[in-house]
Design a protein with these regions (language model features):
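Residue-level detector of flexible, active-site-proximal loop/helix-junction positions
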Residues: 10, 86, 113
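Metal-dependent catalytic neighborhoods of phosphoester/phosphodiester hydrolases
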Residues: 16, 49-67, 83-102, 106-108
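Conserved catalytic scaffold of divalent metal-dependent phosphoesterases
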Residues: 97-98, 102-136
Length: 136
């Protein structure tokens, strides 16, 4: 299995009042080109997709435009979005049902199966079931 792992996009970020959307656009274009040439099975975006829990409409549009373009360029590509400390997990999960129809899976909040314990990550084709308690 081949995947691309990325994080800390911080879409919507400004630097000392300077709008960074052009930089973000160039990064996302580069990532789309990489997806087209490398043909990964999955793209994992591990947190801090946005720079703030309440991103601008422009930042959200940039994400959703990217997701649609990425899944159209690489048939069968699965995308996993994981919320970071700058993201609102519930806001990121809000369109999860719609995104799932495009092979985009969102995990914004932690769901525990028990009251603690060691968890192990599971492989396979069940992105809705990513961890289970490790047997004692």
């Amino acid at each position: 299995m081949k995947f691309i792992h990325t994080a800390d996009w911080h879409l919507g970020n400004t630097f000392h009042g300077h709008d960074r959307s052009e930089e973000h656009h160039h990064f996302l274009k580069h990532l789309l080109d990489l997806i087209s040439t490398r043909r990964p099975d999955a793209l994992i975006v591990a947190g801090d997709i946005f720079d703030t829990p309440n991103p601008s409409a422009r930042a959200e549009a940039m994400l959703y435009d990217f997701l649609l373009e990425a899944t159209s360029r690489a048939q069968g590509l699965q995308i996993v979005l994981i919320a970071g400390n700058h993201d609102s997990g519930s806001r990121l999960e809000a369109p999860a049902a719609l995104l799932k129809s495009h092979n985009v899976y969102v995990r914004g909040t932690v769901r525990r199966k028990d009251n603690g314990g060691v968890l192990r990550l599971l492989g396979g084709r069940r992105p809705d079931h990513g961890a289970e308690p490790l047997p004692e």
